[in-house]
Amino acid sequence: MEKHIKKYIHIVSLLALGILFYALNANVPLRNDDLMYSFMYLRECVGNVPHPIDLNAPIDGIGDVFVSQFNHYFSMNGRTPVHFVVQLFCAVFNKDIFNICTSLVYILFLVGVAKLVFPDHRSYVHYVGIASVFWFFFPFSLFYASGISFAVNYMWSLTACIWFLLLYRKARSGLVMGKSGCALALAVSFLAGWSHEAFAMGIAGALFIHTLYDYKKNENGGQKFYLAVAFCLGAAMLVISPGTLGRLHSVGAVVDIVDAVYSRIGVLFFMKRLWLLLGLTFFLTVAGCLNIASFLKENTFLLMALCIEILFILLLGFVNERALLGVEFFSFLLLLRMLCKWKKAKYLLNKYILISFFSIFLCMELNVIKVLSLTEKEYFSIIDSYLADANGFAYQANLDIPFYYNRYISRLSPDSWEVKALSYYYGKPMHLFPASYKEYLLHIDSYLSPAYQVENEGGLYKIPETSLYIAQVDSCHEEDTFVCTFSYEPVPVKEKYSLRQVWDRSVYENKYDRYEIKVSPVRWNDRSVVIIDNAAFENRVLQNIVMKAD
């Protein structure tokens, strides 16, 4: 009877966590790349659209998704199963169905991590503890209110890889599955390998080394071998994709030797969980609290996967923090497994401490859900204003959101990729400004006078008390794109590097002290003007702005 009660408590606790996760995602509309996945993908880009999509061909059924993903494999990257699911929910099904499915995947994620960290015994406390720990200490909000594309690419892919690790562990322990179970396990292994390179590359490399070791000991063969082969075949499908190879070539292209070396050294400083793992390992080993030989033996596979992921990142250099998710996850997983081996950690893993920790997590998550409902209303209000305005102008009020919620909440910003995505999705250029700029922008004509002209810049005017610049370009057409080049006084290399990482895709670095941002002119009272918001650069000394046709 007691055993059944514990089982029901496990189920109820997991369902409660799943419902909380559902509430988070229920307040997130289609965002960012989700909008692009509503259209058919092509083999190459058309016009100025950064994604190779046909804006005149929205997805009209599952058959279109197959064709679109076939093209996507050649033009974008090799994550075909992942993006098939993304496009299915973005274009064929709807966000409500996705919210239910992703909540179930989140439950599988929690169960999978619990099985890896606590292989022998698990209670409801472990599930709520893992949910709380990942909420506070894992660096990526991609697991939470992140939209369809990010959630499937990262959380779903990671969950598939976690369950593959559990299957592989069972196969290595000698468990023999029946034919139907083996067929299902092979399918899961293949799809997990064909999910996301941030996880699959490390696991595939560790599987290869494990298989060679088994071959040397004449222990190769059996179901563990077939699972490893299936996973590696899936990972190979990721790597050999023409889209992936093209992206790797563009990322790995050496523009400047100093920048190439710095990006590979600098990436190490972003691996915070790795340094925490190394530091704690050293401390516990020196203090005699950890049997390092036993720990290394028990976690050989995970350590190999971690090392291969680090090597993979060092070869590529820093791309973005999302690329580090595999390194951070394996480091964090090993850290949790180490704490479980440390006898004194039982005080940290005490049931009452974990429940108290969960209470803080619950209060914070409920507040985030409340704020997300406000940002969702704001999002649709901005869309309505933008569509109703003849010039595509929209204004965003300043919401008083605590800074510690920023990692869980994504809002529109004037220079974000999402503004461009909305422009493509609705077929109308979007121009988003702070609400305080509205009165200025309604009277643009009054600022196109010599009194507001920027010195030494004949066609450039500045609106006082704002970071807005206006350039009149009567000879251009609305579909033209101009590039504004901002020149700054030299800044330290470290600062330049950090700046380069936080700007979105519309901003490009040119020889360390010059930055370019692409803008499109808008029609205003029968003339074309370019409106430049210099807010992103307000902490720098602006020397000049050069307009040139792109």
Question: Which residues are covered by each model-predicted region?
Answer:
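Alpha-helical transmembrane segments
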Residues: K7-F21, Y127-S132, L186-A187, A228-L233
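Transmembrane catalytic cores of multi-pass membrane glycosyltransferases
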Residues: Y22-I97, I148-V152, S189-C307, L314-A323
